[in-house]
Amino acid sequence: GGKEGYPLNSSNGCKSGRFAGTNSNENTECKGXDAENGY
């Protein structure tokens, strides 16, 4: 992880929170922040 991610229910399926999980797309698609969690 290390990138800020979108919520799990978003179109790209990334994990929520400041540190995205082991999603294969985390470095290319988990950009921006998770507004709901204030990141």
From Swiss-Prot:
Keywords, alphabetical: Disulfide bond, Ion channel impairing toxin, Neurotoxin, Secreted, Toxin, Voltage-gated sodium channel impairing toxin
Chief subcellular location: secreted
Region feature Disordered, mapped onto this chain: 1-39
InterPro entries: LCN-type_CS_alpha_beta_dom
Localization in the cell: Secreted
Signal peptide, first to last residue: none
GO molecular function: ion channel inhibitor activity; sodium channel regulator activity; toxin activity
PROSITE patterns associated with the record: LCN_CSAB
GO CC terms: extracellular region
Every LCN-type CS-alpha/beta domain range: 3-39
Sequence ranges of Basic and acidic residues compositional bias: 28-39
Tissue: Expressed by the venom gland.
Keyword Membrane assigned: no
Residue ranges of the TM segments: none
The record's note on its domains: Has the structural arrangement of an alpha-helix connected to antiparallel beta-sheets by disulfide bonds (CS-alpha/beta).
Chain's role: Beta toxins bind voltage-independently at site-4 of sodium channels (Nav) and shift the voltage of activation toward more negative potentials thereby affecting sodium channel activation and promoting spontaneous and repetitive firing.
Family, as annotated: Belongs to the long (4 C-C) scorpion toxin superfamily. Sodium channel inhibitor family. Beta subfamily.
Protein name: Putative beta-neurotoxin
Organism (species): Tityus pachyurus (Colombian scorpion)
